[in-house]
């Protein structure tokens, strides 16, 4: 979709396509554009039979650049890689959503890459199934949470994988030792978000990491949570 805000034109892609620049400006700084690239998140792991749930998938990678001539409030993760466009078509890749674990003891899939202008955001790491055996979360833009159970002491997937600066995401949460107190023996962890790590395994629901907000679409929206 294409919308306008003041003198700015905002192109939003929710699927693959082509960003077409028909004509550039005679003023060079106006050809440096703002962009936001967000990948798809990882799926959540399959749950158990009432004794334990799967861990959360990590958020897709988040990468943003704000042109000096674009008047909006950027996220805390705004980067420093400018793109100067010319009159041509730029392929857009939007990562398809991941699959969650469909049943107990079934893992999810990782998220998928989104890209434009050679700027790529990594898909989120998958969550793992519970409760039959603990596993480490998968790495990705943000990492998937670790799952609980025996033998325990599992690690959330690493975020910002592959590494970029500023970071595109954070780690998934970890799980504790086995056996744990009965109420938390199978607790799994939350996936990471662009704005913070996933919550470690504990009794009760585990939260995923928070996203980050940007006004690149002319109003504040939180992404990659």
Question: How does the language model describe each region?
Answer:
Residues 1-225:
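Glycine-biased low-complexity/repetitive sequence motifs
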